[in-house]
């Protein structure tokens, strides 16, 4: 059959050589070649056209060589209810051919798929009209996606297929400033739309997918020719190197706690201090809703900085994720309140919530129940003022509040190692506080008295924190102020902990009652 006599508007996806004028054809369904087919899903065939539809016949005696494709392709179409699209990939070109098990390859790139539609088929057919997909390097590049953000890949950079944005980001990170800190839990989603939201998680994912510095000059090292299969030692070397780089990124500038002197630990705590947070002061006179809205917005902003501050404490990131979350959920309001006391220590009768939000005691009368909390904050601040609290002492005290905030038992046996690290870290911060007090020049007896006075004030901070949490929960239940984001998560965690303690307390009381009944019945039986 002559191709010139076929209908002009027919876009056949069949690959053929432009120099040939006759293309042998055979009837029957075919499938678009794909390097990835999900084995766990079934696909039904949907015919787009057939010889009967386009009104031409096929010679029965035409010879078709092996590997030829048919003229009536049936497209693999997902069955109803299946949401995963079919992957359409061109065959790899000889020029850019890669070993199937190359250490540079990443299996995650197979997860990226193209949706099947008529436009895709037309583009595929038009692209193969004059060149075979087997020998077209451009068709291979079109079928690859960035292993980091899932955007279209511009090439093979630093050992993986990546886009220009992730390539430039990784280049900047390995050449310059890369001590990024995740404001959340190091589990941010990195995709095309959110790749710029968290630099720390983006760099972590770069290392996870296999980006390495040694792969930056791949095109200049003869990789354009077909490479031989690497041996197993080469595989292990590349994988171990990528893993080491990933561990180095997740622990940026991490110092071994055992080698830190008290002075170095204090300096690290000083560098970890969060910045001042600004919040717009509501218009006067204050109302219950306006004041609570300002305080909750401020608390939510400070919580983000508090998490970053905790991650910068040497040894905190070595704890298990369970212990990290548990400590932050238990002490978040204590940490915020002791920071409020430090800002207010030079302003008697004032509470410096923020540089642009300064309140006195009388302004708290507009909110029901908050006046008692203001009095507790002012009294504890006055006691710190009498002791002439120093800035380095404040840094150590705040870190001790975080590390000593939770006394709940470990959830599993594997948490024992994390608990041991937590105890070691708390002892190191306590030694730093003792060192700071010793440098003040007072006698040994006065040093012991001062240390005891500072530690006794922590119970007052905890009491004020409990009152504040209870008041905030009441305001939330009364719908006085909406609570969102991190602040809502902290309150929910406090509520869940309270429910668990109530359950355990009721169970304990029932056990005591049953034991008392058994004890009273035994003498009667005798």
Curated annotation (Swiss-Prot):
Region annotation Disordered: residue ranges?
502-526
Phosphoserine: residues bearing it:
84, 102
Q: Where in the cell is it found?
A: Nucleus
Organism domain of life:
Eukaryota
SUPFAM superfamilies per UniProt: Glucocorticoid receptor-like (DNA-binding domain), Nuclear receptor ligand-binding domain
Which residues belong to any copy of the NR LBD domain?
A: 261-494
Could you list this entry's UniProt keywords, alphabetically sorted. Answer: Activator, DNA-binding, Lipid-binding, Metal-binding, Nucleus, Phosphoprotein, Receptor, Steroid-binding, Transcription, Transcription regulation, Zinc, Zinc-finger
Residues in NR C4-type zinc fingers run 146-166, 182-206
InterPro entries per the UniProt record, alphabetical: ER-beta-like_N (IPR021064), ER-beta/gamma (IPR028355), Est_rcpt/est-rel_rcp (IPR024178), NHR-like_dom_sf (IPR035500), Nucl_hrmn_rcpt_lig-bd (IPR000536), Nuclear_hormone_rcpt_NR3 (IPR050200), Nuclear_hrmn_rcpt (IPR001723), Znf_hrmn_rcpt (IPR001628)
Cellular component GO terms held in the UniProt record: chromatin; nucleus
Q: Which GO terms describe its molecular function?
A: estrogen response element binding; nuclear estrogen receptor activity; nuclear receptor activity; steroid binding; zinc ion binding
This chain's function reads: Nuclear hormone receptor. Binds estrogens with an affinity similar to that of ESR1/ER-alpha, and activates expression of reporter genes containing estrogen response elements (ERE) in an estrogen-dependent manner.
The family note in this entry says: Belongs to the nuclear hormone receptor family. NR3 subfamily.
Task: Share what the entry says about its subunit structure, partners included.
Answer: Binds DNA as a homodimer. Can form a heterodimer with ESR1. Interacts with NCOA1, NCOA3, NCOA5 and NCOA6 coactivators, leading to a strong increase of transcription of target genes. Interacts with UBE1C and AKAP13. Interacts with DNTTIP2. Interacts with CCDC62 in the presence of estradiol/E2; this interaction seems to enhance the transcription of target genes. Interacts with DNAAF4. Interacts with PRMT2. Interacts with CCAR2 (via N-terminus) in a ligand-independent manner. Interacts with RBM39, in the presence of estradiol (E2). Interacts with STUB1/CHIP.
Task: Give the protein name, as stated in the record.
Answer: Estrogen receptor beta
The organism of origin for this protein: Sus scrofa (Pig)
Gene that codes for this?
A: ESR2
